[in-house]
Amino acid sequence: SLQLLPDYFFHHDALKQKKMLGCYSLMLGFDEPLDLDWDAAQLTGTDISWIAVNSSKPGRPDDYSLLVHSTNEWAEEHLDDDVDAVKAYLCSQVAEIIGQNVYSAHHIDLHRWRYANIPKQDNNTLFIDSESKLAACGDWCKKGRIEEAFRSGFDLAKEMNNILLD
């Protein structure tokens, strides 16, 4: 948003303070289910922040798959690393965490999200400059998740409606 808005935008300095963080998503597809007694795990103290049995979600194909997210901190340090090295490292971490062989996966895919998340923010989900008649909103205002993009857009629409009706 900052690149689209003029320097005189009232919230220009606040927007300059926003910094998106990276994340790696690793998808592992297996011929047979792994022996896990959970569908999702949020982790601390490791370079992996999230592991989910993606195939357990409603409406997903029956093929057994795991979705793995790195921590933002680890990703930030390794955003420009070789993709194969990142895959190998994350696979080794997953294998260590779940105590099972993940190298038998028939599908291994990695996606690098340069702008995946944002550090915890205040409650400001949108930025309106009524003087210049400009506004900014997005996932980057709150938490860097798709839900926050919708909430931020919804909040902006409500606020604009209030302004226009006054």
For each of these PLM feature ranges, what is it?
Residues S1-W38, Q100-Y103:
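Central helical "cap/lid" subdomain
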Residues I128, K133, G138-L165:
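A conserved FAD-binding loop/helix module that cradles the flavin
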Residues L34, R60-S65, S70-R114:
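Flavin-binding catalytic cores
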Residues D47-S56:
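Short, solvent-exposed beta-alpha or beta-beta edge segments that form flexible loop/patches at the rim
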Residues C23-M27, I48, S65:
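Short hydrophobic/aromatic beta-strand or adjacent loop that forms the aromatic wall/cage
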Residues S56-D63, H107-A136, W140-K142:
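FAD-binding beta-loop-beta segment adjacent to the flavin cofactor pocket
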Residues D35-D47:
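Short, glycine-/small-residue-rich phosphate/pyrophosphate-handling segment
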